[in-house]
């Protein structure tokens, strides 16, 4: 989940401080409203076909700073050898957000999407007609499609906030991200946040038993508080908080609870980052992204209750592989799901900026979930339908270029086209006699190409210095300003590390690594052996000039059309068999030593170039 961080509180301090605090009023009074479970009554099925009502919103999410009392610190206490599940009632009504109500309570988006068939041994998948790619990914960017239009070429007008780098915080740890420009100047422009409105109903988790458990407790006790959860184990800690395995009292459901000390966040000027992460989590509804079940605040802590992934992260899983690298088949599975996650985020105007194996978690069914959004950048995006010319189809790549109805696994031939996906208006008006005289390789002339959806925030610009040293894009290191192309650079580094067991530009120290990223060419080791397609994809992604980088203009669509993914059925990717399914046994710590995580304490201020 998140790695070591300076100033992390122990598990007992979280629970003991909550039980013994006297409430003051650090924030304007209000009532925090957690996210609600999706209503099954809103799901509408008719013969296997689903309908979706998309409501467009033009309202904005206004960032508001919290007012916190200074000087409140946690009392250092010894860790208990046995965690207690008994906690006194806690009134958090005085420690909520200034507005008191989540955006999700104000905006209802009824989204009757298909079920998430993510069981590793499932024998049934939704039919391609019901789950082809345009229905499973493109339509999920519900509230960001405010200005979708059809044009002859991509006409994407995007704007984003500019962040000024005033200070530097670096961590020598490989697992900890670095962040500069946390002074509060990285607030999003109000006009760029309309796509981040909270989604009340999340169809991808409609049948999740965790929703039922939360609803049962809420019906019985009202608002969820810290007393309703029993913290079992510390899973990890990061720059703005610690993550615990938590069990909802009276149920057998487990969650991952991120606990953040509000006083420390205020002192380190990280409140805005915590708020950004919460708002992003509220807006997500995707099979490979986390679900925020609820969130609440005490006088001291801000807590996010999310999905728990028992499989750990891909970094730990890679360490257990022979040679400490994955097979190419396994890599293709993991990076394909990560690619869809990044595509969805970009459609919402979210640049992730922190992709690395440590942030890719493995669910209980073996599929992945992207985590940690506190470094993400929010910006505006204008999804555009672009008419594709026949020239795009006849280029020498030798693989299909159209998503949705054209199978990506074969060359443009008659048997590649699904007749059910086309209506007569897509066919040419020539007679059958003329059509029969056409050779097979001219089939593309008979079909009007489907438009492509371009939703890449290419004009987004930020001056922040954020990320992990080995994954930083050259434009970030140079301080030239960066946009969505940084996610495709990190995607290339991520692909390289999974295939070869190490990153391509790692130096003897962090400073040497940064110089290698800027000045050293990309090299591949002799072992292990990987396919030409994999190397070619990495070369396209790790181009140092962002404007020449693969996916710079057309986003994930370009990458999905690469030969490396030619055997991927994007429509049914959730039904694919994972390379490895984690064991369901959770080993809980038994001693204080197992629970304690010491802060790294090695933050440095470094001037680059």
Curated annotation (Swiss-Prot):
Q: Where is the composition biased (Polar residues)?
A: 1-19
Q: What is this protein called?
A: Protein kinase PVPK-1
SMART domains annotated for this entry?
S_TKc (SM00220)
Q: Which UniProt keywords apply?
A: ATP-binding, Kinase, Nucleotide-binding, Serine/threonine-protein kinase, Transferase
Record-listed ATP binding positions: 235-243, 258
Where would I find the Protein kinase domain in this sequence?
Answer: 229-565
Q: Does the record bear Transferase in its keywords? A: yes
* Coiled coil feature spans: none
Which stretches of sequence are listed as region Disordered?
Answer: 1-51, 80-100, 429-448
Record: active site? 354
Q: Which reaction does it catalyse?
A: L-seryl-[protein] + ATP = O-phospho-L-seryl-[protein] + ADP + H(+); L-threonyl-[protein] + ATP = O-phospho-L-threonyl-[protein] + ADP + H(+)
Q: What class of enzyme is it?
A: transferase
SUPFAM superfamilies assigned: Protein kinase-like (PK-like)
* An annotated Gene Ontology molecular function: protein serine/threonine kinase activity
Asked whether the keyword Kinase is assigned, the reply is: yes
Q: Species name for this entry?
A: Phaseolus vulgaris
């Amino acid at each position: 989940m998140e790695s070591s961080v300076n100033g992390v509180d122990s598990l007992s301090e979280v629970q003991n401080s909550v039980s013994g605090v006297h409430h003051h009023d650090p924030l304007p009074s209000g009532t925090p409203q957690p996210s609600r479970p999706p209503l099954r009554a809103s799901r509408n099925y008719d013969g296997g076909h689903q309908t979706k009502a998309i409501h467009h919103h033009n309202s904005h999410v206004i960032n508001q700073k919290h007012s916190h009392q200074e000087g409140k610190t946690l009392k250092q206490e010894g860790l208990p050898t046995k965690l207690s599940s008994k906690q006194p009632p806690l009134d958090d009504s005085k420690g909520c957000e200034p507005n008191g109500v989540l955006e999700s309570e104000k905006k209802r988006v009824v989204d009757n999407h298909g079920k998430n068939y993510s069981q590793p041994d499932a024998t049934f998948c939704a039919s391609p007609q019901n789950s082809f790619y345009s229905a499973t990914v493109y339509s999920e960017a519900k509230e960001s499609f405010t200005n979708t239009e059809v044009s002859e070429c991509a006409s994407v007008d995007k704007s984003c906030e500019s962040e000024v780098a005033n200070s530097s915080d670096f961590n020598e740890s490989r697992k900890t991200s670095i962040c500069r420009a946390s002074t509060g100047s990285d607030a999003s422009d109000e006009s760029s946040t309309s796509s981040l409105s909270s989604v009340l109903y999340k169809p991808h988790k409609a049948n999740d038993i965790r929703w039922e458990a939360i609803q049962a407790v809420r019906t019985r006790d009202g608002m969820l508080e810290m007393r309703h959860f029993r913290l079992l184990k510390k899973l990890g800690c990061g720059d703005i908080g610690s993550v615990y395995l938590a069990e909802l009292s009276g149920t057998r459901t487990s969650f991952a609870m991120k606990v953040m000390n509000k006083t420390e966040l205020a002192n380190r000027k990280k409140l805005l980052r915590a708020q950004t992460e919460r708002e992003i989590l509220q807006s997500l509804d995707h099979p490979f992204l986390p679900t925020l079940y609820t969130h609440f605040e005490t006088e001291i802590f801000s807590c996010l209750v999310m999905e728990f992934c028992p499989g750990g992260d891909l970094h730990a899983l890679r360490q257990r592989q022979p040679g400490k690298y994955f097979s190419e088949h396994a890599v293709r599975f993991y990076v394909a799901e990560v690619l869809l996650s990044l595509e969805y985020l970009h459609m919402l105007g979210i640049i992730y900026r922190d992709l690395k194996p440590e942030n890719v978690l493995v669910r209980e069914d073996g599929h992945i979930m992207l985590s940690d959004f506190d470094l993400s950048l929010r910006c505006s995006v204008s999804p555009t339908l672009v008419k594709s010319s026949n020239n795009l189809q006849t280029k020498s790549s030798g693989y299909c270029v159209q998503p949705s109805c054209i199978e990506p696994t074969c060359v443009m031939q008659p048997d590649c086209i699904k007749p059910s996906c086309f209506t007569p208006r897509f066919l040419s008006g020539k007679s059958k006699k003329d059509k029969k005289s056409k050779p097979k390789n001219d089939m593309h002339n008979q079909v009007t190409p489907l438009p492509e959806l371009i939703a890449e925030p290419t004009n987004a610009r930020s001056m922040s210095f954020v990320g992990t040293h080995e994954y930083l894009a050259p434009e970030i290191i140079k301080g030239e300003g960066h946009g969505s192309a940084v996610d495709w650079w990190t995607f290339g580094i991520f692909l390289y590390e999974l295939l070869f067991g190490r990153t391509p530009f790692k130096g003897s120290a962090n400073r040497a690594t940064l110089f290698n990223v800027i000045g050293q060419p990309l090299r591949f080791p002799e072992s292990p052996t990987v396919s030409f397609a994999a190397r070619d994809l990495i070369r396209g992604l790790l181009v140092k000039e962002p404007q020449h980088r693969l996916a710079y203009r057309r986003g994930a669509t370009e990458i999905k059309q690469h030969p490396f993914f030619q055997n991927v059925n994007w429509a049914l990717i959730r039904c694919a068999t994972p390379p490895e399914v984690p064991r369901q046994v959770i080993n809980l710590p038994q001693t204080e030593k197992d629970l304690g995580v010491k802060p790294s304490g090695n933050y440095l201020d470094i001037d680059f170039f």
